[in-house]
Amino acid sequence: MPHPSDEIKLLIESNSADVLRLRRRIRETFALRDKSPSKLQEWRRACEIFHSRYDELAFPGGYHGALDRLVAGDPYTMEAAICFLEIRPYFFRSGYMFDAMLRKAKRAPLNPEQRARLQIVVDEFKAWKAAKQLKKVSEGSV
């Protein structure tokens, strides 16, 4: 039987792919924007579309206000935040979102299952940071 969060995770992954696609379109049109007025317009339109859709794609229910909703205990936002942290999507500004969401999730009124899932994320993140630091030390860059 699928977990209730599976649908949210699929949405996050799909939205992440859309953000990457829209961002790629900006880069493609940027390279040609000085070639003609129509190319400039294509680039402007790509930017406009990206910025108009980013908030809704970045996080289920919209990223604007999501951290406040998380700490306030909104059930959907709490589940979506845990899902986001578990899959750690990669797109424009997602790393900053991950850090902010992780900090806020620690203070959110999560249920016991969500709290356990968050602890796994925290433990994996600490291990990743330790491995990253160890690599820096072994390369002599610290």
Positions of PLM-derived features:
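Extended repeat-based scaffolds of very large eukaryotic assembly and lipid-transport proteins
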Residues: 1-142
